[in-house]
Amino acid sequence: MRIVENKIIPFRGYLAINIFGIVFTRDLRKFNSNQANFRHEYTHTLQYKELWYIGFIPVYLYYWIKNLFKGMSAHQAYRRIPLEMEAYITENVERYNEHRKKFAWKKYR
């Protein structure tokens, strides 16, 4: 997983974003200081690979829009995306990604 520090991506208020398996962060030192950040983004990298990279964003947007239509706020809709749910729920589980089953995010649908 490649990590790139810059001042543009991600948007303010977010520490990191994973785009096609490349993690962009505003503060590399802060990102690296917490293993949960790394595990969260690495989970997304594995999800990208499972969905052949091009499938990740359509799946992500589908669930976000579906959640918005259910009346959720933008932030609630984001947190209820199955891809995000897996990453958040497991980010504090050491070695989770070493034993993770493919398409594990589907159990959060």
Ranges and model annotations:
Residues 1, 35, 51:
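Nuclease and nuclease-like effector domains acting on nucleic acids or nucleotide cofactors
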